[in-house]
Amino acid sequence: MTTNNQNAVTVTVTGAGGQIGYSLLFRIAKGEVFGDRVVNLRLLETEQGVQAARGVALELADCAFPLLGEVSITTELSEGFKDANAVFLVGAKPRQKGEERADLLAANGKIFGPQGKAIAEYAADDVRVIVVGNPANTNAAIVAAHAEGLDPRRVTALTRLDHNRGLAQVADKLGVAVRDLKNMTVWGNHSASQFPDVAELTLNGEKVADKLDAAWVNDEFIPRVAKRGAEIIEVRGRSSAASAASAALDHMRDWVNGTAEGDWVSVALPSDGSYGIPEGLVFSFPCRSVDGEWEIVQGLEISPAQQERIDANIKELQEEKAAVEEAGLL
């Protein structure tokens, strides 16, 4: 189906032929993020990934989604980001065995820098960008730094997966439904240092921190959420794909349509100095989406124990930033 519907939304997905892209695209085309708006999809791939993207495009056509408009495949950034209203930056170089994190940061910087420049030049003025490819926080910082003229708050990184993992772990521990839990927070970096925080988490409006044993929170919950990706690789033999895609959809849907009443979610975005986080550092905060814009939740009390974990994330992200600066990518 091809349409010139004036209310259509253009969505770009990089790494569209990969596992996460495959899990993402059909749900976007079905209307899970943008409601009843027609969706035009731009599948942006490397030369090596084009064939897989073609296969995805064939399957998208075979689904006969009523809301699916045009589907295009390209390797050119100018074509891939043209008039994009929403961008999912999924494609990234995976870490190889024996590779140092600094090497990974430098390699991905060479991918995300040009993408940031092209987004600023070719995407729609209202573009919303979510970086899924790891290391997501620092990749997002690189995108924002190269997207000259674009409001840095239009560029975010995915920590909703960690947020969702935290909700699932607490729901399982308490024997309750995930839907009854609100105000989970993930602070910091999408890495093993992240701080999933239950201090403000509520069950049917009542805080649950007192119902959770401190030893379980510190020794089991926090490490398990932080290392869940490695656990899934160990069990499944592949990295998280469907859950990562689902979290990215949650993130974009809430950004566009607003967060649920009385709840907040976790979003990594350039800091405005809130909670003492250095300005500009891409850091995960508790956020609400209001009128299509992310707002950091203010006024939460931070204990010394919480601050220690937050500080560890600041340190790690500053070290990542220094590594890409040294490589001339920031």
UniProtKB/Swiss-Prot annotation:
Reactions it catalyzes: (S)-malate + NAD(+) = oxaloacetate + NADH + H(+)
Any GO MF annotation of the entry: L-malate dehydrogenase (NAD+) activity
Entry's Gene Ontology BP terms: malate metabolic process; tricarboxylic acid cycle
Gene3D superfamilies in UniProt: Lactate dehydrogenase/glycoside hydrolase, family 4, C-terminal (3.90.110.10), NAD(P)-binding Rossmann-like Domain (3.40.50.720)
Annotated positions binding NAD(+): 15-21, 108, 115, 132-134
Positions annotated to bind substrate: 95, 101, 134, 165
Cysteine pairs bridged by disulfides in the record: none
Active site: 190 (proton acceptor)
Coiled coil: none
Enzyme class (EC, first level): oxidoreductase
Keywords, comma-separated and alphabetical: NAD, Oxidoreductase, Tricarboxylic acid cycle
Documented EC number(s): 1.1.1.37
InterPro entries to which the protein is assigned, alphabetical: L-lactate/malate_DH, Lactate/malate_DH_C, Lactate/malate_DH_N, Lactate_DH/Glyco_Ohase_4_C, Malate_DH_type2, NAD(P)-bd_dom_sf
Entry-linked SUPFAM superfamilies: LDH C-terminal domain-like, NAD(P)-binding Rossmann-fold domains
TM ranges: none
HAMAP family, sorted: Malate_dehydrog_2 (MF_01517)
Function: Catalyzes the reversible oxidation of malate to oxaloacetate.
Family recorded in the similarity comment: Belongs to the LDH/MDH superfamily. MDH type 2 family.
Protein name, as recorded: Malate dehydrogenase
Origin species: Corynebacterium jeikeium (strain K411)
Lineage: Bacteria, Bacillati, Actinomycetota, Actinomycetes, Mycobacteriales
